[in-house]
Structures are given as C-alpha cells and as structure tokens.
C-alpha cells in the first residue's frame, strides 16, 4: 500500500485521537482509515454520500456508507474544507449512534386502566392516540390560560427546517412565543454580546483565520477536547510556524494547556478583571488604533449590579440595584479610559491569582500591532452570570486595536452544537427572536414576518416568551401547563434539577412530551414519549460556527414508527383549526382562512408547498428517499428553506438557493451572487461594505461597533466555610453533552464509562481522601456520588473540582444553581459552591 503525505497525516491524526480515547479505530490497523478514504475502493456494495457531522458546532463533513438499509460506515470527507478528511474520535463512530439496543420505535404514553395517568406506566400507543392526547392537553391549556400556557423547548441540534417549522407553529400558529432552544444554555450570551456590540449575530471571521494568525488566545475553551478538529489546525499552525503563540485561560488546567506558551489559570469570574486589564494596558501603552476607533467605533457604559437571573424572591436578586438591565449610555473615549484605569497589573494579578508576568505577556500580545490574534471562546465565557459582558469585553480588546474583520485577526465565538448557529440563532427559535436577527418585541420586525408568512397583522404576539430556565420555574409554579421538548435532554442538562426541574415535570397539573430516539433521563420523566428519527434518517441542514450552511439527504429509514421532529410538528399542526387558536378579530382580517387548519395556513400556503416531488427527484435522483416530503406530497424541506431565506436575502444574511447546498460542502453567508463571504464588515471581502468605506459594522445604523465599559462583579454563589470548593462542570473528548448517543457506542463507553470528580491532590489530602475512592459532592441543592480522580487530563487548582455532565447515573446538575446572565438568560454551569466528603 502506498501512502501519500496527506494520507499519512490523516492516519496519524486518527491514531492520535484513538490513543487519547483509549479505543481501537473502527478500521484496524490505523492506516486502514487512510487506505479506504476513496469510497470507490471501499466496496461497490456500499453506497456513499456526504453529511454534516451530528456532534459539535465545528461542522465537519463526513462520508456516510450505507448498505442494506443501515449506516455501516462513516469516514472523514476529504473534500470538506472544514475537516479535510479528518474526524475526531466521536466522528469515527458516527455509524453506531443510531443503533443502540434501546432505540425507541413506538410512541409511549403513561397509562393506567386503559387511559392516560400521570402516575401510570409507559404503554405503547399509536401516533393517532398520542396526538389525540396531545391535542386535548394543548387545547384545554390554551382555553384556560391562553397561548402562554403552552411551550416548546427545542434544540441547536434541530435541522434548519425543523427549527423553522417549530417557530412558525408556535409563534404564528399557536401565537405563543414560549419557544426556546437548549442553545439558551450554551450560546445565548454570545448572541446578546454580538447584538449589543454589532447589532448583528455571529462571527465576522471564519476558520481560514487559523492558517493566517500569529497567535491564538483561548478564553474558557478546551478546544483540544471540545473542538478537536479545529485544534488540529491550530496545532499545525503552532508547530509549523515558530513565532506562533498559544495562550490558554481557564479556571483549571486541561488538555489545551499542553500546547500553551502562556498558561493562565484564573479564579472563577475574574476573567472580567483580566479583560479590563488588557484594555487598560492597550490604552496606557499607546497601543490604541486611534484611526480605527475614531472611524468605526462608539463608546458606551452599561448598567451594573444587574442581579443573577434568579427568582425575584431570591435575596441576591432583591438586592440588585438594576436587575436584568441592559441599558447603555454614550460616553467618550476618555471616560472609557478612566473606567478601566483601576484595572492595573497589580490589582488584576491579586484579584485573578494569575502571576503578573503571564498577564503582562498576554496584554502585550494584544497590544502588539504586528501580531495577528484570534480569540476563541465557548462555555467558559457564555455559561457565566456575566456572560454577555465577557463577550462584550473581548470585543473591546479587538476593537481598540483594530484587530477584527481581517484575515488572521478577530474575536471568534465557537458553538457547541451542530446547528446552534444555523437553527437556534439564524432561524430564530429563541423566545425573543424571529429569523435573521429580527425580534418579536419590534413591531416592524413582526410585520416583516407576518408578510412573509401571509398572516394577518397582529398574529405574532409582541411579548417575549419564557426562556429555558423560566419555563422550568413556570412548570413548577403551574403557570405553564403543556411542555413539548424535542432533540435535547434537558432533565439531565438543565440546572438545579432537584429544586426547579423535576418538580415541574412531575407536577400533576402539567403534561410533558419528549421527542427522542432513546429513553433518556428526560424521556423517562415525561408523560408522553414520541420516537424520533435521527441524523441521516431524514433530510437535513445545519449551520456551523463559521456561518457555513450544509445539507444532507436522507440515506436510511428510521426504525419502526419513529418520525422526524419535522414530521411531528407539521402533522400535529393539522389538529388545530384557525378559529380554535386565533381570536375572532384576527380571523376577520383573513376570512379566507376560516375553517382551515394551521397546516393549511403555515405549510400549505402556496409558498412552502410549491416545490413538487418530481423536482426533488430531478435534484437527487430517485435512489434517495424523503419520508416527510412523500408524506405531505411536496418537497417540504425546499419550501421551508426558500421561505425562510426570504428573511435574510438583501439584509446581510443572504443564503444561496436551496439546490446549491446539495452540491457544495457548505457555504458561508452572506452568499451574494453565488459567492460566499469569508470576512464580514471589511471592504474587499464583504459585498455589503461599499468601496471607500473600509470597515462598516452595518448591523448598527451608524456603522459603528460599540466599545462598552463594564466592570468585574462577583459570582452568584461563592465558597464559604461549609461549602468550601468551587464546582465547574463541562465535557470530555469521548462523550457529547449528556451522552445519550455516545454512551451507546460501545467503544466510547468503554473508554470513559463513568463521570469522575477531578480534584487537586492537596485538596484530597486535606480531606483525607484518596484517588479511586467513592466520594460525595454536595451542594445546597443536592448530592451525587462519584469516583475521585487526582491525576489525568483535568488538573484543577486547589479550591476547585471539575465534573463532566455526560453521565446519567451521576447527575451533576442536581448540584448546580439556576443562576443566569441577566441579559442573555444563559445558565452559569461553571460556578457554584460544593463540599466533598467520603461516601
């Protein structure tokens, strides 16, 4: 066998990933992965096609091999610009995620004596029976409490059209803005940060920045494990360019520190002080790009002491001077300089516990006009009671130096889910959003949506709906009666399970529906479980962290009676007549809708249903099945996408025509005249920036980005004498989120079967604990028992423990506090107080 240099690199990367996970590759020996990259050599009886990876927000493309109606193999797509033929260890086992032994294939309803009972046993029912019960529960709840009595909790793992259909069904059909995605728990702070600074969501740069940068700074991001393919590109850049630097900031050491030139372990929440110190250093050393800020920036000061997103009755929430306030007032550059001046090197070193020389080295990197810097961050910034502020403050640094919107330079918010950008954010499945950065609170935005959707004026309610944490509180308080969860496992992933989540789900007054392929913690706590099609069992589309939209075709059928989330929403919409859910005065504005169902109005409206099945056959060939399209009799996905795309075209969110994406390995929006945009807001790269403008942040009416003065403020809950340690939660390389897919892959489960608690050896010795012992981790809200680990990949400093959240047998969110960023409503999973004792 002859190996090219490319094959050799790929094979070694695969072997490295497998070694890290302590598993064997699906093809043995390791070189076999390189040897079978070309599908033509893998056997004529296997059919291959492309798909976006099912896991993180990187957006890798994989080749999917099918045979006999099953996915039998997956491999990295050598034509994909994102991953260039590589997979991480999870990607190598994608072929197994759909075939767990406990896959759900029929709807299951809690029943006793032949009818629904909240305390009954799960019993198989037909889809008609399931929808009959759902219909009765929805209509009863809405008759008594109006549209605000029902809610839907979606996902950054929804396909683009699943999220879009759900948004239409809830916000236009049922007229309820109680729709939120699980991306509220991971990306909401990034969204609000973008909107406050630029008034336009998502990164201005792209992954091409990696090959052009002189330095990388990771803020609360363990890319080595959470975005390993991007990390491989950073590693290549660092090791092949001797002057390249990597700086890593975190509250504990992890695998990304192994490549770091500058390691900064800071005290929880003090990243805010570090960010302000860097801004102060830039100003004090004369490193401000004065021309840039004079032309392209405006200065603001934000309200402070804004609380912690806790219940209004909580003492810390009651004590806040400006609870939940995002108000900003204009200031001058001189006032901004005075604001950050107290954040000296000495003060910041003392506050953060980071050695002064390391802080100074980091600040000098940003201040050096010759160094091109990319800042990456994920949950360390976002899952933070001041997560929006943290996002704003890192933008301040890049704006002060002009290191933004240019190749190799820029702030880059990474996403954790495959379509947190493409579905949750761009489609607008948040409780306050509509597609393309429109919001329900703005009457002009509502009018745009109503016109595109052919709805009477006043259909979309103007009040923001309940966000993720508020939904759980409303269920517990019996204000929310029906809750439909799709494509996530919130009973495991949501915060404060014991006090806020489980009581609401098992409240006798609530009805909980969970659509899932497996019997997850969420499914087992529900009243009705709907079996769901997964990944390539349906036609899909995701949008990744670099604004890249990617499509795939349905390649196999779902098992049994499992149906996609899209099918479920569209089919259920047939159960509602317009008159049943709209007030009479609204129906009177569109009398032609009288007697029609929500399906007729939303999905058979002359736009969504205008693409015929023969059009699908021409595009894909008859070899490809499409369950949803065959069921409704038209090319549903194409109709939904083209209607949705109308929101963004001509407004800086331009998407290409639907058919283009099936031919490409994704395109980065805005796509204008068939050309994708790599760097936004910069003349010569962005078609929306006119000749002579240089830079224009066109999301803002004046074209100027906001540099915002915001202080360091403490966390919601800090260690004390009894609960004397910080708890930080997160992930590991081998598992994804709650492990509902990866723990069903035997190789990944064997590699890391259980969650452990990582602790500094000195902390263990102080408590009389030893590595390998069973210990209890206890917070004010609950306790769990785990094995103690004082070595290995994660190395917390004294005073902090780390626990991953993938293990349904050790629910770490029994411990966490439901504090949120008051602006983004995103949960802070990184900071609460615990104690650790022998079990």
From Swiss-Prot:
Cofactors demanded by this protein: [4Fe-4S] cluster; Mo-bis(molybdopterin guanine dinucleotide)
Domain 4Fe-4S Mo/W bis-MGD-type: from-to ranges: 46-102
Residues reported to bind substrate: 805
TM ranges: none
Pfam families: Molybdop_Fe4S4, Molybdopterin, Molydop_binding
Enzyme category, top tier: oxidoreductase
Catalytic reactions on record: 2 Fe(II)-[cytochrome] + nitrate + 2 H(+) = 2 Fe(III)-[cytochrome] + nitrite + H2O
Binding site for Mo-bis(molybdopterin guanine dinucleotide): 90, 157, 182, 186, 219-226, 250-254, 269-271, 379, 383, 489, 515-516, 538, 565, 729-738, 813, 830
Main localization (coarse): periplasm
EC number: 1.9.6.1
Cofactor binding note from Swiss-Prot or TrEMBL: Binds 1 [4Fe-4S] cluster. Binds 1 molybdenum-bis(molybdopterin guanine dinucleotide) (Mo-bis-MGD) cofactor per subunit.
Binding of [4Fe-4S] cluster, residues: 53, 56, 60, 88
GO molecular function, one term: nitrate reductase (cytochrome) activity
Superkingdom of origin organism: Bacteria
Family: Belongs to the prokaryotic molybdopterin-containing oxidoreductase family. NasA/NapA/NarB subfamily.
Function noted in UniProt: Catalytic subunit of the periplasmic nitrate reductase complex NapAB. Receives electrons from NapB and catalyzes the reduction of nitrate to nitrite.
Subunit relationships: Component of the periplasmic nitrate reductase NapAB complex composed of NapA and NapB.
Record-given protein name: Periplasmic nitrate reductase
Organism per entry: Laribacter hongkongensis (strain HLHK9)
Gene that this polypeptide is encoded by: napA
């Amino acid at each position: 066998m002859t190996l090219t240099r490319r094959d050799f690199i790929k094979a070694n990367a695969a072997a490295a990933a497998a070694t890290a996970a302590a598993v064997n590759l699906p093809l043995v020996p390791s070189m076999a992965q390189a040897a079978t990259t070309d599908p033509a050599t893998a056997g004529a009886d296997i059919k291959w096609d492309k798909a976006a990876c099912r896991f993180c927000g990187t957006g890798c493309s994989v080749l999917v091999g099918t045979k006999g109606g099953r996915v039998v193999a997956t491999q990295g797509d050598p034509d994909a610009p994102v991953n260039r033929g590589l997979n991480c260890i999870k990607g190598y086992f994608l072929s197994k995620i759909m075939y767990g032994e406990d896959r759900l294939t029929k709807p299951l309803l809690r029943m006793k004596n032949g009818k629904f009972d909240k305390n009954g046993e799960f019993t198989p029912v037909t889809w008609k029976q399931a929808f009959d019960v759902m219909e009765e529960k929805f209509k009863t709840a809405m008759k008594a409490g109006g549209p605000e009595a029902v809610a839907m909790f979606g996902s950054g793992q929804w396909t683009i059209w699943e999220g879009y259909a759900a948004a239409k069904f809830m916000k236009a059909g049922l007229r309820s803005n109680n729709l939120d995605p699980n991306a509220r728990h991971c990306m909401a702070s990034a969204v609000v940060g973008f909107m406050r600074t630029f008034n336009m969501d998502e990164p201005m740069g792209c992954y091409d920045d990696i090959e052009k940068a002189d330095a990388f700074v990771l803020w609360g991001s363990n890319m080595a494990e959470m975005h390993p393919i991007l990390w491989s590109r950073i590693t290549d850049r660092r090791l092949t360019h001797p002057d390249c630097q990597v700086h890593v900031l975190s509250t504990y050491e992890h695998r990304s520190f192994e490549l770091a030139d500058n390691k900064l372990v800071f005290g929880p929440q003090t990243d805010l002080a570090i960010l302000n110190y860097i801004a102060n250093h830039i100003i004090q050393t004369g490193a401000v790009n004065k021309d840039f800020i004079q032309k392209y920036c405006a200065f603001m000061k934000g309200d402070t002491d804004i609380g912690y997103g806790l219940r209004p009755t909580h003492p810390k929430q009651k004590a806040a001077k400006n609870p939940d306030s995002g108000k900003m007032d204009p200031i001058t550059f001189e006032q901004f300089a005075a604001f950050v001046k107290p954040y000296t090197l000495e003060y910041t070193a003392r506050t953060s516990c980071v050695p002064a020389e390391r802080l100074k080295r980091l600040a000098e990197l940003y201040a050096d006009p010759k160094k091109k810097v990319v800042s990456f961050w994920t949950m360390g910034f976002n899952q933070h009671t001041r997560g929006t502020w943290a996002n704003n403050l890192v933008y301040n640094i890049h704006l002060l130096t002009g290191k933004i919107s240019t190749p190799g330079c820029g702030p880059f918010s990474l996403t954790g889910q495959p379509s947190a950008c493409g579905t949750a954010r761009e489609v607008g499945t948040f409780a306050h959003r509509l597609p393309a950065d429109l919001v329900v609170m703005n009457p002009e935005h509502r009018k745009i949506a109503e016109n595109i959707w052919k709805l009477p004026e006043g259909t979309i309610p103007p009040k923001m709906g309940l966000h993720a944490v508020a939904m759980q509180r409303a269920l517990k308080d019996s204000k929310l009666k029906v809750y439909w969860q799709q494509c996530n496992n919130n009973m495991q992933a949501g915060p404060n399970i014991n006090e806020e989540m489980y009581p609401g789900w098992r409240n006798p007054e609530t009805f909980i529906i969970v659509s899932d392929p497996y019997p997850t913690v969420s499914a087992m706590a529900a009243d009705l479980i709907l079996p769901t099609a997964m990944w390539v069992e349906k036609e899909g589309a995701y949008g990744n962290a670099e604004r890249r939209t990617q499509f795939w075709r349905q390649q196999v059928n779902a098992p049994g009676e499992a149906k996609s989330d899209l099918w479920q929403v569209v089919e259920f919409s047939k159960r509602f007549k317009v008159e049943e859910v709209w007030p009479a005065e609204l129906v009177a504005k569109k009398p032609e809708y009288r007697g029609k169902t929500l399906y007729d109005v939303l999905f058979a409206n002359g736009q969504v249903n205008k693409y015929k099945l023969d059009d699908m056959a021409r595009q894909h060939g008859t070899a490809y099945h499409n369950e949803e399209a065959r069921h409704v009799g038209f090319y549903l996905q194409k109709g939904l996408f083209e209607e949705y795309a109308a929101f963004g075209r001509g407004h800086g969110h331009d998407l290409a025509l639907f058919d283009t994406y099936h031919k490409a390995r994704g395109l980065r929006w805005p796509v204008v005249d068939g050309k994708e945009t790599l760097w936004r807001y910069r003349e010569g790269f962005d078609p929306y920036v006119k000749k002579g403008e240089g830079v224009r942040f066109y999301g803002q009416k004046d074209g100027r980005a906001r540099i915002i003065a915001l202080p360091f403020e403490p966390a919601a809950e800090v260690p004390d004498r009894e609960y004397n340690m910080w708890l930080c939660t997160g992930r590991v390389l081998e598992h994804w989120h709650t492990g509902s897919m990866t723990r069903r892959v035997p190789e990944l489960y064997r590699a890391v079967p259980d969650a452990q608690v990582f602790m500094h050896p000195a902390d263990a010795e102080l408590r009389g604990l030893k590595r390998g012992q069973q210990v209890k981790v206890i917070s004010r809200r609950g306790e769990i028992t785990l094995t103690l680990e004082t070595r290995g990949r994660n190395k917390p400093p004294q005073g902090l423990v780390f626990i991953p959240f993938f293990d349904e047998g050790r629910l770490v969110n029994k411990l966490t506090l439901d504090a949120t960023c008051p602006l983004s409503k995103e949960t802070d999973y990184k900071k609460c107080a615990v104690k650790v004792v022998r079990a």
